[in-house]
């Protein structure tokens, strides 16, 4: 029988691969290029862009159906996007039925904007018609808020 001394080539290759993977993880962390945080930021940016597009379509539809343009998109006040409408605002929410008269409201539901629910990365969203800007806060505090976007 032969006595085997030393390490095999396979063990050496596996060790080198593990060291390379660990080095890559350390380099990414030190450079501030954290893929997990980048993905959270990208998700938030995507949700913000989708919200902006949905609000733009909603405003266009509302203005087309309301010839007096007397609604939540006047030059004063803000429009808050909410999960469900508070009882004191229930009568003011614009109707989803085409052809009916819409009334002014300072709240709009996510469903009205075409979302199945609030996007997971967005905590609150308020639209200011006077400036055309959103005030959006993220559920993840590490993500940059797009206030004034």
Residues covered by each model-derived region:
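N-terminal leader/signal peptides at the extreme start of proteins
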Residues: 1-7
């Amino acid at each position: 029988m032969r006595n085997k001394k030393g390490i095999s080539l396979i063990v050496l290759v596996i060790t080198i691969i593990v060291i390379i993977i660990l080095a890559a993880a350390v380099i990414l962390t030190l450079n501030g290029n954290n893929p997990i945080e980048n993905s959270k930021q990208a998700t938030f940016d995507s949700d913000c862009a989708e919200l902006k597009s949905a609000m733009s379509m909603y405003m266009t539809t509302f203005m087309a159906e309301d010839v007096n343009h007397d609604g939540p998109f006047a030059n004063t006040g803000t429009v808050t996007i909410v999960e469900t409408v508070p009882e004191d605002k229930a009568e003011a929410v614009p109707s989803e039925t085409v052809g009916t008269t819409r009334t002014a409201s300072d709240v709009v539901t996510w469903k009205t904007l075409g979302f199945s629910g609030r996007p997971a990365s967005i905590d609150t969203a308020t639209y200011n018609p006077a400036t055309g800007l959103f005030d959006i806060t993220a559920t993840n505090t590490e993500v940059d808020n797009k206030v004034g976007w």
